[in-house]
Every structure is written in C-alpha cells, then in structure tokens.
Curated annotation (Swiss-Prot):
It is a multi-pass membrane protein. This is Mitochondrial glycine transporter. Disulfide bonds: none annotated. It catalyses: glycine(in) = glycine(out). It is found in: Mitochondrion inner membrane. The keyword DNA-binding does not apply. HAMAP family: SLC25A38.
Length: 347
C-alpha cells in the first residue's frame, strides 16, 4: 500500500515539475519552426528598413537572387534568427503561462474587470482555462499586462542575439561569422553594444505582445461563437471533440494571423526605429534621436518601411507559433489528465 501511495506522489510531483518544462519545450519548437520557414521574409524586412528608400523591396530581392548563392542568401542569418526566436519563444511562453496561472490562481477578477481566475484544483488546470487552450482565461487588462511583461523580459534576455541577427542580416557589415560579429561589437562598442536598441525594442514589444494577446483571445472567442465551435479542452471526450468543427487548430491559426496583423500595424514605427538604432548606433544613438532624424530626413513614410513584409511574416509566424504551441500544450494536458485518472483507478 505504501508503495502505491509513493508512486502516486511521484507522479503528481513529476506532473507539476514537467509543466513549465513542457511549456518551454513547446515554445522552443514552435519558435524554431516559424523562424526557419520564414527567415527570407525577416531578412528582406531588415534590408528594406535599413534603406532610406522605403520602396527598395524589389531591387533587394533581385540583388539577392542575382548573387552566386541565392538560396543561401535568402536564409542568411538563420542561425541567430532561430536562436533568438526559438529560445525567445520558449522564454516568452513559459513566462506568460507562469504569469497568467499566477493571476488566475489569485483570483483577481475584482482587480481586472472581467477576469475569470480561480485556484487550480487537484493538480488540474484552473477552472478559468479557456475552451480553446490550456491557458487561463483572463480579462483584456490582465491579458495586456501579462503579455507585455512576459515579452519585455524575454526580449531583454535575448537582446544580444537580436543585435547579432540584425547586424548579420544587414549588408552594412561584412561579418564572416556570428562569433566575429560579437567580437567586433564588443571591441568597438563594448558590452553595451549588444543591447543597442533595447529601449525601442521594449517599447515596440510591450504594446505588441499585450495587444496581440488581447486580440488573439478575443478573436478566438468571437470565431468560436460565430462558427458554433466548441474547441476541445483537456477534459473533452473523444466523442465531444469529433463534434467540434472547425478544429481548435484552425480557429487558433486564424486568430493568430488576425491578431498579429492588427498589432503589427500599430507598432511598426517602433520596429523601424529599433532596426535603425541597432544598425547605426553612432548616428541614431537612441530612440528619440532616431525618430527625429528619420522624420526630418525621410518623412512619416519611413516609419512604416517594411510594414507589408513585417505584417505578412508576423501573421504567419505568430499563427504558426501559437497554433503549434497551443496544440502541444493541449495534447500534454490530456495526457497528464489521463495519467491522473489511471492512477486514481489503480488506487
């Protein structure tokens, strides 16, 4: 009897410990998938934003395709991009889940109007979990704040990789390797150079991530209601899941694309400023100076350089990343729920 009890305790303990780890792994996989597939769009965005000619997309594409190694040229910078997006997504999703779960567990609905938090019971997900995901369902205000905080924290940790990615993708620098780029930056700009543009990045990422989560969750609810779909949760039976057209994945994918398009349009000026500061820190120095110079030299249009590319890439990357992440987490939640039921059945 004691052995059975000990096994039960071990299983529950491993379940609690595995959840943050799996959120990290799911975020890493989703980030790697989207970054590798969409690297050409990210490279083109960087090249377009570095130019004072905001309509330089076609010449940039022709230049790359005319090079001796066009395929390699389109995927230049894949390694730093994959590292940044992969581990950045892992840190972001893990932090976001931790924050949202903590908010839901403390039941702060009276602080965040419309919140539906509640304490987890018996090791299961909080009752505030949305039907379309394993994440807690919060109010718009709570979604905005948790999304912004999680993104800025992950962005700070990954900022050196982001700077290396931007410099390596740009044709302003002739770096032969990432290690060579890192040594050159530290030699000429100090460690501070590895964090160039963090202010603009934080100001871009905080509202983007917050708005994205708000738009994403609202879009999922609206689409599910409009299409009459009840997306499967960890507690759904196989029969109930078969009666859920369209699938959870399709709702999450469409919602991710729509949310990214809206959030990207609103925050694009910050992205352009960030790119200029990271590429030419000696000229632009900081966000305020960069914005003033860009408006004086190139006009308002310069703040929306690369918008089409960024919107297309963000829509696809966010839709892919969030769909893969949500599906992996829901799969894991179902497996953990089944394990708990099996253990209870044995006991």
């Amino acid at each position: 009897m004691s052995n059975g009890s000990h096994s039960s305790v071990q299983l529950k303990s491993s379940t609690y410990l595995s959840k943050p780890t799996f959120h990290f792994a799911a975020g890493l996989l989703s980030g790697l998938t989207s970054s590798i597939l969409l690297q050409p769009a990210d490279l083109l965005k960087t090249r377009v934003q570095q130019s004072r000619e905001t309509a330089a997309l076609l010449p940039t594409i022709r230049s790359i395709l005319a090079s001796p190694h066009p395929i390699q040229g389109l995927w230049r910078g894949t390694l730093p991009s994959a590292l940044r997006t992969g581990f950045g997504s892992a840190l972001y999703f893990t932090s976001l889940n931790t924050l949202r779960t903590a908010v839901a567990a403390d039941d702060p609905g009276y602080l965040f109007r419309g919140g539906h938090g509640s304490k987890p019971q018996n090791g299961n997900s909080p009752s505030g979990v949305s039907a379309s995901s394993a994440l807690p369902k919060l109010s718009h205000t709570a979604n905005l704040i948790t999304g912004a905080v999680a993104r800025v924290a992950a962005g700070f940790v990954m900022m050196p990789v982001t700077v290396l990615k931007v410099r390596y993708e740009s044709d302003y620098y002739a770096y032969r390797s990432l290690w060579g780029a890192a040594k050159d930056i530290v030699r000429h700009e100090g460690v501070r150079g590895l964090f160039a543009g963090f202010g603009a990045t934080a100001i871009r990422d905080a509202p983007y991530a917050g708005l994205y989560v708000v738009f994403y969750e609202q879009s999922k609810r609206s689409l599910a209601s409009l299409l009459g779909a009840s997306s499967p949760s960890a507690r759904s039976t196989p029969t109930e899941q078969q009666k859920s057209p369209p699938s959870t994945a399709s709702i999450n994918f469409i919602s991710g694309a729509l949310a990214a398009g809206l959030a990207t349009t609103i925050t694009n000026p910050f992205d352009v400023v960030k790119t200029r500061v990271q590429l030419m820190p000696s000229k632009y120095k900081n966000m305020m100076r960069a914005t003033a110079l860009m408006l004086r030299e190139d006009g308002m249009r310069s703040l929306f350089g690369g918008l089409g590319l960024r919107m297309g890439r963000k829509a696809l990357s966010s839709a892919l990343a969030w769909t893969v992440y949500e599906e992996l987490i829901m799969w894991a939640e179902k497996r953990w729920a089944e394990e708990q039921r099996d253990v209870k059945g044995v006991l």
